[in-house]
Each structure stands twice: as C-alpha cells, then as structure tokens.
C-alpha cells in the first residue's frame, strides 16, 4: 500500500519564491524511496503559469485566469494529466490524496467526480482517457443534478448501468472494465471556478454555466477538508461549498456499508490568496494558518511530511544553511485587498439572482449587481481561532458575514523537528 498524492495549483502559481500553499505542501511531502508508506507525488502548476515575468506574460496569465474562472478553459488538460498519473501509479489498496487551490481545487474535485463516474482505466488503455472525460462532461450536461450527487445509480456484475442512452460515461466504464478506487482525502483551499457546458435544450444560447458531475457531492470521497476565505468579495471568486452531510460508500455499487463522510470546512481571515497563499512571503503570515490546519488534517489521515520542512515553510523557523526565510503565522498578518481596478469593473455586471448570497443585494428582473457581495457563512460554521483572535486584537477587523453561532477550530500546535 502507498499514498498517491495529487497537487493541483491555482491559475498562475509556479515554482518561485512567492509560492502557494499547495506548492508549500508539495515541498513538505516525503518523496524518497525510504518513506513508509511510499508516496507517489504529482504536482501541476495550473493554467497560466508565468514563463517570463514581463508585462505581456503577466497580462496573458491574468487573461487566462479570467477565462479559466469563467469558462473552465484549460481544465481538461489539468484533469487528464492528473488522471493519467493515477492510471499509471494506482494499485489496489493505495490511498489517494487530492489537494488543490483556487481553480486547482476545482480541478481535483472534477478529478474525483470523473473517477466516481468512469472509474480508473488500466494503464494500457490510457489513450482512452480523453474519451472518458468527454463522456463524463456529456453526462454532466444531460444530468444537471449530478453535480450535487442527486442521481440514482444502478449496476450489475459488469459495472454501472447507463441511466439512459445518453449516459455514455457508464457505457465507457463497462467497455473498459475499469477499476473503482475510492478517494481517501480531498483537501482544498478556497475552491472557485465554473464550467461552461453545451446544452442541447438551449436553442438560442447553446450553453450554460454548470457544475460538473459529483463536484459538490461525491460518495466515493472518504474525507473532505476545505479552507475558505471570509473576506473574499470578487464575484468571479464565489466559493464552491461541499454538501454537508453526505455519505461515503466503500463499495461503489453497494450501500450496505455506507457511512457518514468525514467533512470539515473551516473559515479563515483574509481574501482568496490570503488563504491559499501566493502573495510575497513577507506578506503571507495569514496564509500559514490554513496551511498548518490542512497539513495537520492530512497527517491525521495518513499523509507523510518532513517536519523540518513544515517548520521552515509553515512555522517560519530558519533552517541551517538555507538562503531562504519564511514568515511565521500571525493573527496580525497583512490582509490584502484583492479588489483591484480590473476586478472592480466586473462587480457591476448583472448576475442571475440564483447566484445571490447576501440578502442586502436587490434583485431586478431576475438579476442583481454583486458590487463586492460578501460571502454567506451559515450558522454553525467552523471558524478558525485565528479569526477570533484577530477580531479581539484588531478593532478595525470586523467581518460583516461572521455568523452569530459558530464552532471554534483551535490554533495549530508546533511539533518537534
């Protein structure tokens, strides 16, 4: 048995000095042959990675970011790369860990949904992976409720039975005699993005903005963790919450041993990249809390990390002979303003009222103007202790969306190493 760890970054993150929490986690992972259990590790920087740090390439990366968030541009390549890695490395009994930030968080949720629907084909059939993804997306467009798992699934000894003649994904799984692994752990920072899918029932506008199948609920996931940003307000960065509660099925085709899925979604102070990382290191103290929380949760689920690297990257302990320094977590860390001028313009574009979260926004003719709409945090949500300490020590920090009733999540405890 081994761990297979997939790390998918947000659009525009790359291996440089201003690194995201996904890349910091990747660097903390034990990857040597001596690691017990062995860990096979995959990292994808995401769409829009900067090849050159000049104005043109930054503009191009930002354009790809908007396009990717709005339409899912580039998602297929990211999903197929990670899926192919799993195809070649998975063996029965292995534990699959999926991590992602931003658009990369949605990527791993799509990957988990794809595995639930078509399974994991054998290595000698990897050339068919693209066809499987097409079938999965067609199923998503013909079955809108599948995004939230609101579908019934039946099977026989050869695999899943197609729901109808349009369920090409189930037919694909039967033809390829696929494997059916479960997903041991999904850990995401601030999932955003949607996908435009074709709709045969739309005559004038032949597409709609939808969730791909099993990206909001997925019974093949055992443990789900999400770190969410309290202070993000950009309309293009709406949080994709996970349905809670839902069930986990050990056997894809048998409900007999189903059990409640282990789910926790925790809110942290800051905007999107204050939670997922990626700002200059000297301004990244807030992002260390969601990083440490995720590392602790994943370690409890069996992930193996190097404690000295965790101490350096997450706790800010200077490592001997290292030319790099990293900040420690601080409740007084910089909280960035992500609403730059370019993003601000998009706040005045009308959106369908079905996406409205904040009650103070007025609806006219089925639409509303987001205009820095706060994220809705429900009563009973999990709020990290660092948020409450920041409120207590900083009089100017008063998030308007903090619920009246919530559960506290304690601060991390520094270990040895």
Where are these regions (language model features)?
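Active-site- or binding-pocket-proximal scaffold segments within functional domains
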Residues: 1-417
């Amino acid at each position: 048995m081994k761990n297979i760890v997939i790390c998918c970054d947000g659009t525009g993150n790359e291996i440089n000095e201003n690194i995201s929490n996904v890349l910091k986690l990747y660097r903390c992972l034990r990857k040597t042959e001596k690691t017990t259990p062995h860990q096979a590790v995959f990292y994808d920087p995401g769409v829009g990675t900067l090849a050159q740090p000049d104005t043109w390439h930054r503009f191009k990366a930002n354009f790809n970011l908007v396009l990717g968030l709005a339409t899912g541009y580039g998602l297929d390549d990211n999903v197929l790369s990670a899926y192919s890695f799993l195809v070649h490395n998975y063996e029965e009994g292995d534990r699959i860990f999926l991590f992602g930030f931003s658009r990369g968080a949605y990527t791993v949720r799509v990957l988990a949904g794809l595995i639930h629907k078509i399974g994991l084909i054998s290595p000698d059939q990897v050339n068919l992976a693209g066809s499987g993804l097409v079938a999965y997306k067609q199923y998503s467009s013909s079955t809108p409720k599948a995004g939230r798992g609101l579908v019934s699934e039946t099977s026989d000894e050869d695999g899943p039975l197609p729901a109808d003649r349009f369920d090409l994904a189930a037919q694909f799984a039967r033809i390829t005699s696929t494997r059916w692994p479960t997903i041991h752990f999904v850990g995401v920072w601030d999932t955003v993005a949607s996908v435009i899918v074709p709709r045969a029932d739309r005559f004038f506008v032949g597409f709609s903005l939808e969730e791909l199948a099993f990206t909001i609920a997925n019974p093949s996931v055992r443990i789900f963790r999400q770190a969410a940003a309290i202070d993000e307000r950009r309309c293009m960065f709406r949080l994709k919450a996970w349905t809670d509660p839902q069930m986990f099925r050990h056997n894809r085709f048998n409900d007999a041993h189903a059990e409640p899925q282990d789910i926790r979604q925790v809110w942290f102070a800051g905007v999107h990249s204050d939670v997922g990382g990626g700002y200059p290191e000297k301004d990244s103290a807030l992002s260390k809390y969601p990083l440490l929380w995720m590392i602790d949760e994943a370690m409890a689920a069996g992930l193996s990390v190097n404690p000295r690297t965790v101490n350096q990257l997450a706790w800010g302990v200077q490592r001997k002979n290292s030319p790099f320094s990293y900040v420690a977590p601080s409740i007084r860390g910089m909280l960035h303003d992500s609403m730059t001028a370019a993003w601000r313009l998009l706040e005045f574009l009308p959106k369908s009222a079905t996406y409205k979260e904040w009650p103070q926004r007025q609806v006219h003719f089925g639409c509303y103007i987001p205009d820095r709409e706060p994220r809705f945090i429900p009563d009973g949500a999990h709020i990290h202790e660092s948020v409450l300490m920041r409120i207590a020590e900083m009089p100017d920090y008063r998030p308007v969306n903090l619920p009246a009733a919530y559960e506290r999540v304690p601060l991390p405890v520094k270990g040895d190493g």
